[in-house]
């Protein structure tokens, strides 16, 4: 009798665990995944009033998720189109409050906010995005991003209403520390338009790289080892009038921008930046062949030990120093 009682108690205690294990195993079976995909898409469509389609969902052990062929349609607009999303996360570190991301990749994404957001419309396409992160510590608010790559991405922002919104006075302290080891951009552009004053801003980056960047959001400390951007253009236009001859502040068109910076950091009054290279051309004919130098500051002084500017027709050397109250600037004569 006692053995039978122990047996029944054991079954009662083990049944929820067994059911949970069976459920988890079922999630990895393709027919079950296909059924859940259809049911989830149908439920989401009914709840949102939109047409939501998902061509394929594939979950592989332990946490490797592949989603293909996602469409979100609110006639006549397609709000979201996604060719593929792949998320590969290690399972065991999650039980320790850590996130180890082997790979997150997005391919061929198109977004159109239509009228979902008051006062603005966002449209864009994303060609490819990849992220690898080993060292996200949720309890201690630390994130290490080993690699992030973004390419063939173009975003348009149209602001229909520039009325200022009430400022949110609620404050929450952000304590995260972010360590970005490597970031690469290729063929990325952004444009913004404010119809109220006909202001248009557009920027295109052909290639950009950031290495060893750090951000301590609690203490407001920032730094990076190197930054390089090339093949960049920036356009700024206000009004509908044709650009005036020469330099026109209402119509600025910079092209062939190349910027190289090293050893940058910002910690309150402690700042440093090495300008390794800078060059650009403007629509008006203004051209900077080269700009190199260094900027340095601490609790006592702000100093430009050397800054050299070269244009096609002139050269200028600059040194400057200030003690936050008094300044001494020396500029050599152009040659």
Give a label for each model feature:
Residues 77, 282-288, 310-315:
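Solvent-exposed loop/turn segments connecting transmembrane beta-strands
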Residues 275-278, 301-307:
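Transmembrane beta-strand segments that form the barrel wall of outer-membrane beta-barrel proteins
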Residues 292-295:
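Feature captures outer-membrane beta-barrel proteins of Gram-negative bacteria and organelles
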Residues 56-160, 172-195, 204, 211-237, ...:
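Flexible beta-edge/linker motif
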Residues 162-169:
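Intrinsically disordered, low-complexity segments enriched in small/polar residues
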Residues 1-49:
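N-terminal type II signal-anchor transmembrane helix
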